[in-house]
Amino acid sequence: MHGGQGPLLLLLLLAVCLGAQGRNQEERLLADLMQNYDPNLRPAERDSDVVNVSLKLTLTNLISLNEREEALTTNVWIEMQWCDYRLRWDPRDYEGLWVLRVPSTMVWRPDIVLENNVDGVFEVALYCNVLVSPDGCIYWLPPAIFRSACSISVTYFPFDWQNCSLIFQSQTYSTNEIDLQLSQEDGQTIEWIFIDPEAFTENGEWAIQHRPAKMLLDPAAPAQEAGHQKVVFYLLIQRKPLFYVINIIAPCVLISSVAILIHFLPAKAGGQKCTVAINVLLAQTVFLFLVAKKVPETSQAVPLISKYLTFLLVVTILIVVNAVVVLNVSLRSPHTHSMARGVRKVFLRLLPQLLRMHVRPLAPAAVQDTQSRLQNGSSGWSITTGEEVALCLPRSELLFQQWQRQGLVAAALEKLEKGPELGLSQFCGSLKQAAPAIQACVEACNLIACARHQQSHFDNGNEEWFLVGRVLDRVCFLAMLSLFICGTAGIFLMAHYNRVPALPFPGDPRPYLPSPD
């Protein structure tokens, strides 16, 4: 039994020794490299030497863009490479050890920070280990979640696009000490933000159109002094407006259409029209308040959606004004307003023909003159001519008067047939006795006829003002409908032509994208 355990113990001891020897090589190398190493000193053999530092940005998630705070939140990996002559070794001296992992706090770092941050976090989120190669070159890939400042242009919101940037520079070193560069792969400079399709998470509100990168020199530095280099990574992003179209724009258009449709209510239903229009105004005000909570509080520009909502408010207010004017015209009467000939000609003849509206034909001019006489005459008005009576009285009264006259004539003829003298004397006596009664009857008939014709004239005047109100309501409906359609089309055509440029920088033909394979 003891003889069987001997080989196993020997193998276990050999494995432990080899592992300890491997760890000892890495520990020995780290101890040798860190001996007399000062991480605060720049890795330059001579004072005039410049340390080359290359940067590459990998975007894994565009988290959000807060318009009110004008802050872009991104999840990135920052790839930095530089060489430190103090960290060189010969792999043969350390049994072929080609890579050494060293805590980043133990080596010199170029102090690359995000200049345009908005939360006070300049550095990376995790100080992970650096990878050191035998030639002294260091590879560092720390992750970070940055909140960078992004100036928001709200002119075409929500059909807008934004140009945001992440600006990196060394916090302590100038161009005479370090040289910031963009990373290179296969001899090609990576002048763009790298996106790994497998690791990248698409944003639901923004679509990335361009992602170039550029080297810039600090323009604030004096010409005789060395400035600070900056590496700027740009993100040109286009908003996906579907959310705002479904939840704000479409409801506003439908609600405003309801305000347009109130013209189909009767002209005298002004109260109901105003009630519907004011309810629409309240709903539009709620949507305007929701938009105001989304966009930044700036006076540099007015958002496109705010312009459209304001336009809808103006249209709705005009509809309310139209309803009030139409109601005022429809309720007029001949006692309070006299209709001018021009108004009658335009609103009762010309416009109904143009608008294909059915309006009753106007009375002849003679009837109008006679009706005015009836309106202005006194209770003792007498019938002067048969033509005026025929024009003013209805057919039933004309038949009654003709029958009454024929009866009087027949009675007179019957009296005359009995004898000229007797008949004439009796006829004259009858006339004398009946004269006051006949006169009273005639005056009573005249009063009744005058009152009826005055009422008929009053009703005709009311109907004419009502017809004018109908025509005016139809004109206002067509005007508001045209204004609503033209304004809506014009505003959204402006949004249609607001597109991200085909190239990221005007005048620069380079696309700043990886060349196709």
From Swiss-Prot:
Localization, UniProt: Postsynaptic cell membrane; Cell membrane
Membrane topology category: Multi-pass membrane protein
Glycosylation sites: 52, 163
GO terms of molecular function: acetylcholine receptor activity; acetylcholine-gated monoatomic cation-selective channel activity; channel activity; transmitter-gated monoatomic ion channel activity involved in regulation of postsynaptic membrane potential
Keyword Glycoprotein attached: yes
Catalyzed chemical reaction(s): K(+)(in) = K(+)(out); Na(+)(in) = Na(+)(out)
Annotated disease: Multiple pterygium syndrome, lethal type: Multiple pterygia are found infrequently in children with arthrogryposis and in fetuses with fetal akinesia syndrome. In lethal multiple pterygium syndrome there is intrauterine growth retardation, multiple pterygia, and flexion contractures causing severe arthrogryposis and fetal akinesia. Subcutaneous edema can be severe, causing fetal hydrops with cystic hygroma and lung hypoplasia. Oligohydramnios and facial anomalies are frequent.
Gene Ontology cellular-component annotations: acetylcholine-gated channel complex; neuron projection; plasma membrane; postsynaptic membrane; synapse
Cysteine pairs bridged by disulfides in the record: 150-164
SUPFAM superfamilies for the chain: Neurotransmitter-gated ion-channel transmembrane pore, Nicotinic receptor ligand binding domain-like
Predominant localisation class: membrane
Extracellular side: 23-240
Domain of life: Eukaryota
Chain ranges on the Cytoplasmic side, renumbered to this chain: 331-474
Protein family: Belongs to the ligand-gated ion channel (TC 1.A.9) family. Acetylcholine receptor (TC 1.A.9.1) subfamily. Gamma/CHRNG sub-subfamily.
Gene Ontology process terms (BP): acetylcholine receptor signaling pathway; chemical synaptic transmission; membrane depolarization; monoatomic ion transmembrane transport; muscle contraction; signal transduction
Key word Cytoplasm present: no
Listed Pfam families: Neur_chan_LBD (PF02931), Neur_chan_memb (PF02932)
Functional note: After binding acetylcholine, the AChR responds by an extensive change in conformation that affects all subunits and leads to opening of an ion-conducting channel across the plasma membrane.
Protein name (database record): Acetylcholine receptor subunit gamma
Keywords noted in UniProt: Cell membrane, Disease variant, Disulfide bond, Glycoprotein, Ion channel, Ion transport, Ligand-gated ion channel, Membrane, Postsynaptic cell membrane, Receptor, Signal, Synapse, Transmembrane, Transmembrane helix, Transport
UniProt cross-references to PANTHER family, sorted A to Z: NEUROTRANSMITTER GATED ION CHANNEL
Chain ranges passing through the membrane: 241-265, 275-293, 309-330, 475-495
Segment forming the signal sequence: 1-22
